[in-house]
Amino acid sequence: MHFSQIIQFTLVLAGLACAAPQSNPLLETVMLSNGETTVAVQVEAMSPASTGSHIGGEILARGQLVSRQDSINCKGSSLCSNRQGFKDSCTTAKNKIEDTTYASGGAKSGTCSGNCGIFVQGKDCIATGAVMRNAYNAIRNNGCQACGSAHWNNGCYITINYITGC
């Protein structure tokens, strides 16, 4: 094989590697209820930072009641919108929260409507429907118009965020 053939072969292999389907490391799949069925939706993966605004509320982690809510932020996907249609979808998603238990990484981690999802995040975190509704209200009452998260000091949080696939 000549040097020019080796270069051509290498370029072909490089092109094939780039053309192969790859998962987007910036997207995470979350299972949410849309009121009719549970669907797998995509959300931008993020690790929200806390702002220090305190309000009450309890969340479970690793099967035990361990923490109180300690902060809220207004961070979310770059696609979060202050438009009324998105905010209306979030209100509809909130109204779909049932009196059940939601779990991060579980078959049902929250609810969705349109492009808005409300869900539990963190390692082995679970929350009741009442905690989900209270967190939603706290995020809104803290001035977050579109997306945001309520955080607990055990690494669990409830998030309102832009999603696709609901």
Feature map (PLM): residue ranges:
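Fungal secretory targeting signals
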Residues: 1-27, 31
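N-terminal propeptides/leader regions of secreted preproproteins
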Residues: 19-69
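Mature secreted bioactive peptide module from preproproteins
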Residues: 64-166
